[in-house]
Design a protein with these regions (language model features):
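A general structural motif
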Residues: 3-5, 72, 125-128
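Active-site neighborhood of HAD-like aspartate-dependent phosphohydrolases
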Residues: 1-52, 158
């Protein structure tokens, strides 16, 4: 399954970027760091490397997206973030681990439903695909609205031809 000439919206956290489980204290200290604005691009890249140091790029999904992109698809990341700074750090992380793969990173407010955003800006939902790890929150509503939607696990199983 490779798509052609579509807009693919893909989630960042636990979809493209695979996180390890953080202990509660580490999560709190990480969130505290987000309140410090970083204006220098190199400093932001270094911060992104540190913050996402134990994260892995989902290379199977990345290869799939690259094939789609080579077939005329546009690939956009949708991320729910309270802080614009963290969305910028995600852009930097993608530039490091997936240069040229992503056409745009779109920050939605925390808790905003991605399907509602997609439905509000896309005229032809037949040319849209959503890939997200949250089945109940994102995939089911997308399918109800007629938007083609998949979990990263489904894409990876299909890419490996295992179903």
């Amino acid at each position: 399954m490779i798509f052609e000439n579509k807009t693919i919206y893909v989630d960042f956290d636990n979809t493209l970027c695979l996180f390890k489980q953080l202990p509660a204290t580490e999560e709190i200290s990480t969130v505290t760091e987000l309140n410090v604005p970083i204006k220098d691009d190199n400093a932001l890249r270094n911060w992104a490397r540190k913050y996402y140091k134990d994260c892995a790029f989902n290379s199977v999904l990345g290869c799939f997206l690259l094939q789609c992109k080579n077939n005329g698809c546009t690939v956009k990341v949708l991320t729910n973030e309270a802080w614009p700074f963290k969305a910028q750090a995600k852009k930097c992380w993608l530039q490091i681990y997936a240069p040229g793969l992503i056409d745009d990173v779109i920050r939605l407010s925390e808790g905003q439903i991605k399907v509602d955003f997609i439905h509000s800006i896309e005229k032809d939902i037949k040319n849209v695909i959503l890939i997200d790890d949250k089945y109940s929150e994102q995939i089911k509503p997308a399918l109800r609205l007629g938007i083609e939607a998949y979990t990263p696990q489904y894409i990876m199983l299909d890419a490996c031809d295992v179903k």
